[in-house]
């Protein structure tokens, strides 16, 4: 019988600078939003509001919204979670299954509930204190994924809660909310000496290989777009940007993309340093092909899980 959660690693051997390029791209571009826009609507539990919001912010939502990975990474979609739970003599705890989970279409602000796996019942979130009939503890809260714009349109779609209470509590806390996009990487990725390794968690209730492919496809597209948009200044080197002096053949490296690409073509560069290098050796299309081949190799390795 397969365990509901398994830790695995996906390993591929690549040219070291290409492996580093993919690792750095993954860490900088593959950003899964946290639930940092949280509003407590009612709380008579022994945990204070800040404790609830901190715990909810870091709920591992990718294993719940796995059908929407690509659109969440491109920020076409966001999501929210909602909890309304009262203590009873029979049920004295809260699990992740007690939440309702909704996907948000950012074009229309439509809010759609998604199915939740029954396995979430095994993930304990909170235990109430001893039950007393006359002082039953309750908690009601809602949390949106980072980057969600809270406006009248989206609030009108929250038909499962008291909008008046929501507006009051949201107005009380919105000035102290972090306006920045807050996220985490879905996996830890390392690349020592070209050994690109993804440390992943595989769950029994969905097709991890399909989800991993969505992530790698997103990463490949984002990296190729960044390569096409990347520029190296030609002329005198001024140590503010990566630049190349064709007269002296000196290259100043000041960003990770330049460093990894020129190293792929034989330069032994480091950040914020000068190197004598023939820039004509760089073939961008050849590098992109190597990147695409590497992504195929990564997906092939993931299929062996």
UniProtKB/Swiss-Prot annotation:
InterPro entries: DNA-dir_RNA_pol_35kDa_poxviral (IPR005059). This is DNA-directed RNA polymerase 35 kDa subunit. The lineage of its organism: Viruses, Varidnaviria, Bamfordvirae, Nucleocytoviricota, Pokkesviricetes. One of its GO terms (biological process) is viral transcription. It is found in: Virion. Belongs to the poxviridae DNA-directed RNA polymerase 35 kDa subunit family. GO terms for cellular component: DNA-directed RNA polymerase complex; virion component. It comes from the Viruses. Part of the DNA-dependent RNA polymerase which catalyzes the transcription of viral DNA into RNA using the four ribonucleoside triphosphates as substrates. Responsible for the transcription of early, intermediate and late genes. DNA-dependent RNA polymerase associates with the early transcription factor (ETF), itself composed of D6 and A7, thereby allowing the early genes transcription. Late transcription, and probably also intermediate transcription, require newly synthesized RNA polymerase. Signal peptide: none annotated. The keyword Phosphoprotein applies. The gene is OPG156. The DNA-dependent RNA polymerase used for intermediate and late genes expression consists of eight subunits 147 kDa, 133 kDa, 35 kDa, 30 kDa, 22 kDa, 19 kDa, 18 kDa and 7 kDa totalling more than 500 kDa in mass. The same holoenzyme, with the addition of the transcription-specificity factor RAP94, is used for early gene expression. It is an enzyme of class 2 (transferase). Its EC number is 2.7.7.6. GO terms for molecular function: DNA binding; DNA-directed RNA polymerase activity. Keywords: DNA-directed RNA polymerase, Nucleotidyltransferase, Phosphoprotein, Transcription, Transferase, Virion. The keyword Chloroplast does not apply. It catalyses: RNA(n) + a ribonucleoside 5'-triphosphate = RNA(n+1) + diphosphate. Disulfide bonds: none annotated. It comes from Variola virus (isolate Human/India/Ind3/1967).
């Amino acid at each position: 019988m397969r365990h509901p959660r398994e830790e695995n690693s996906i390993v591929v051997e690549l040219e070291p600078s290409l492996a580093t390029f993919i690792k750095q791209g993954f860490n900088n571009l593959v950003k899964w939003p946290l639930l940092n826009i949280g509003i407590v609507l009612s709380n008579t539990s022994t945990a204070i509001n800040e404790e609830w919001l901190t715990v909810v912010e870091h709920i591992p939502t990718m294993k719940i919204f796995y059908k929407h990975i690509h659109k969440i990474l491109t920020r076409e979609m966001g999501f929210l979670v909602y909890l309304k739970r009262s203590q009873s003599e029979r049920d004295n705890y809260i699990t992740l299954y007690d939440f309702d989970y909704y996907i948000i279409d950012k074009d229309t602000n439509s809010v759609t509930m998604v199915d939740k796996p029954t396995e979430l019942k095994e993930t304990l979130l909170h235990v109430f204190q001893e039950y007393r009939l006359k002082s039953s503890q309750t908690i009601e809260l809602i949390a949106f994924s980072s980057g969600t714009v809270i406006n009248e349109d989206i609030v009108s779609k929250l038909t499962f809660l008291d909008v008046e209470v929501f507006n009051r509590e949201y107005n009380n806390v919105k000035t102290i909310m972090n306006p920045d996009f807050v996220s985490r990487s879905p996996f830890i990725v390392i690349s020592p000496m070209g050994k690109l390794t993804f440390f992943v968690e595989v769950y029994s209730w969905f097709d991890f290989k399909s989800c991993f492919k969505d992530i790698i496809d997103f990463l490949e597209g984002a990296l190729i777009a960044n390569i096409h948009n990347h520029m190296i200044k030609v002329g005198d080197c001024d140590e503010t940007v990566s630049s190349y002096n064709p007269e002296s053949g000196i290259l100043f490296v000041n960003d990770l993309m330049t460093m990894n690409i020129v190293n792929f073509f034989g330069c032994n560069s480091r950040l914020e340093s000068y190197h004598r290098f023939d820039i004509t050796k760089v073939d961008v299309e050849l590098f992109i092909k190597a990147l695409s081949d590497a992504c195929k190799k990564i997906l092939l390795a993931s299929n062996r899980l």
